[in-house]
Amino acid sequence: MMWKNIAPDNILLVLIDFQEKLFPILKKSVVNLVKSNILLLIKMFKEINIPMIGTEHYVKGLGHTEKDVLKEWGDAPMTDKVIFNCCGDEKFLQNLEKYPRPVVVIAGLETHICVLQTVLDLLERDYQVVVLKDAVASSTKLKWENGIESMKETGAHILNTETLLFYLLKRADTKEFKYLVKLLKEQQDSVS
């Protein structure tokens, strides 16, 4: 399946390890961009009824998902894991199997570690994977670029958040599109 064949009824969001204790290794501007896009994704995916599952890496040491994201997350499944590859965690796999969707959209941290390992495993399991380039991050630009390049070379589709959302909505004459425009304006105002 080409990424252009995706639709709200065949995708699932996986949010990987967006935890505040990881933020000090990232540039503040990168954290703000990624957080803004993750919040946009969560709000829109809830609006158009796309299921979401998430992970938190080693909560005992790294704490929980960033508070604003966690508040918006609601009661979607969230797995505490210690394995870098999310697919190596049995509870994560159980959550993934609850939603039999062929396309997995990926956001979170860090691009070259947990995100990369998870994407490679999902591809081996015959999922189509869409990595949102502006909703993943690493401690350095080089590591981020390496992670993105590695995922693309192995078959993941690399998009940005806005491209994906507009593609899913298809048209401008819906309440969902009006909601997206409102969210994009709020996002732009918060960044300026």
Per-range role (PLM):
Residues 2-12, 48, 60-192:
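Active-site-adjacent betaalpha module
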Residues 27-29, 53-54, 105-106, 134-135:
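Short, contiguous strand/loop micro-motifs
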Residues 9-11, 27-45, 49-53:
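A short alpha/beta connector and helix-capping loop motif
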Residues 11-19:
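N-terminal nucleotide-binding beta1-loop-alpha1 segment
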Residues 18, 57, 134:
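Active-site loop/turn elements of alpha/beta-hydrolase fold enzymes
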Residues 15, 52-57:
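Short beta-strand segments at enzyme active-site cores
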Residues 20-25:
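Short acidic, Gly/Ser-rich segments with clustered Asp/Glu that frequently serve as metal-coordination loops
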Residues 30-31, 56, 81-84:
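Short, flexible loop segments at the rims of nucleotide/cofactor-binding pockets, characterized by
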